[in-house]
Amino acid sequence: MRAVLTVVGKDKTGIIAKISAFLAERNVNILDISQTILSEYFTMIMLVDLSAAKTELSNLSEECLEMGKNIGMSIHVQHEEIFNAMHSV
């Protein structure tokens, strides 16, 4: 199963490193990543593969919300199909 992880917040050093390490600990594979800095704001979208993950999507989503609070970012995870349905015209 694939999911989309989005991250938004004030830019600071180590955001990608922290999130990548967090995902690696749970055996979540990063398939694609796009990130940009808009003025002083960091934005990132990751496409991740959960087929070998050590956690379920619902647990990962809750853990990412908590991690986001800890690092001052908004982090959300959605099933890829739900993300696509919500963002199609």
What do these predicted ranges mean?
Residues 1-89:
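A conserved regulatory-domain signal marking ACT and ACT-like small-molecule sensing domains
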